[in-house]
């Protein structure tokens, strides 16, 4: 997948807007940027093209000395979130410049990366949509279990990747092919069609889909 421009933002929640034909469009509102460019990497020096951007400014006392020394080079403040955006071509921004929602336009297709909502420890029926065992006919205390988890002596182990009960959610999820419905630069807002990963106020990365 192509490495393209992107921006950091915060998921504010969902609402709806009306299309030109009067149709109702469910949208997610993302407050994105402005994100100062804290570092620029290029092919000659670093082996690849990328830019590091910051989001959610914090006071100096909340960063350690290595972070402070790194961010002082850009002289744009200190940030809770730093993200490196890798690019296929040269970086169109210089260190210290701002990346804003202006890089997107209504109708554009983007991909959104966020951390899914954590559900805690979940069984196989909730986590993997297993059917469970029979409700009657001798089933005892195992109605929601996963059943057999492997073979006998050969291979004598549970195979890697076997779907079992465990921690559900709280994983990095990328949803591609999302349509930008509206961009409002005066409020640093992007409205995208449908839902995106993560809880309300969760940090997301919005990138152009190459």
From Swiss-Prot:
**Name the UniProt record assigns to this protein:** Large ribosomal subunit protein uL3
GO MF annotation, one: structural constituent of ribosome
Outline the segment boundaries, as ranges, of region: Disordered.
136-156
Record-linked Pfam families: Ribosomal_L3
Family to which this protein belongs: Belongs to the universal ribosomal protein uL3 family.
Per the UniProt record, the source organism is: Solidesulfovibrio magneticus (strain ATCC 700980 / DSM 13731 / RS-1) (Desulfovibrio magneticus)
Spell out the subunit comment: Part of the 50S ribosomal subunit. Forms a cluster with proteins L14 and L19.
Supply one GO CC term from the record: cytosolic large ribosomal subunit
Record carries keyword Nucleotidyltransferase: no
Q: Which UniProt keywords apply?
A: Ribonucleoprotein, Ribosomal protein, RNA-binding, rRNA-binding
Q: Provide the taxonomic classification.
A: Bacteria, Pseudomonadati, Thermodesulfobacteriota, Desulfovibrionia, Desulfovibrionales
Entries under InterPro entries matching the protein: Ribosomal_uL3, Ribosomal_uL3_bac/org-type, Transl_B-barrel_sf
Output the Gene3D superfamilies linked to this UniProt entry: 3.30.160.810, Translation factors (2.40.30.10)
What is known about what this protein does?
One of the primary rRNA binding proteins, it binds directly near the 3'-end of the 23S rRNA, where it nucleates assembly of the 50S subunit.
Q: Which gene encodes it?
A: rplC
**Biological-process GO terms, alphabetical:** translation
């Amino acid at each position: 997948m192509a490495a393209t421009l992107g921006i950091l933002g915060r998921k504010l929640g969902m609402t709806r807007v009306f299309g030109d034909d009067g149709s109702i469009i469910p949208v997610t509102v993302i407050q994105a940027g402005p994100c100062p460019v804290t570092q620029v990497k290029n092919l000659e020096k670093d082996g690849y093209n990328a830019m590091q951007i910051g989001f959610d400014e914090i006071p100096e006392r909340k960063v350690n000395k290595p972070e402070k020394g790194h961010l002082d080079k850009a002289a744009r403040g200190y940030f809770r979130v730093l993200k490196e955006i890798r690019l296929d071509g040269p970086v169109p921004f210089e260190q210290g410049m701002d990346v804003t929602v202006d890089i997107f336009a209504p109708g554009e297709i983007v991909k959104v990366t966020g951390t899914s909502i954590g559900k805690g420890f979940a069984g196989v029926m909730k986590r993997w949509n297993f059917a469970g065992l029979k409700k009657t006919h001798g089933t005892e205390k195992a109605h929601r279990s996963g059943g057999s988890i492997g073979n006998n002596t050969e291979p004598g182990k549970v195979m890697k990747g076997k779907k079992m009960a465990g921690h559900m959610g709280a994983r990095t999820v990328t949803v591609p092919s999302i349509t930008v419905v509206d961009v409002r630069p005066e409020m640093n807002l992007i409205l995208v069609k449908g839902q995106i990963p993560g809880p309300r106020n969760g940090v997301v990365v919005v990138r152009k889909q190459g």
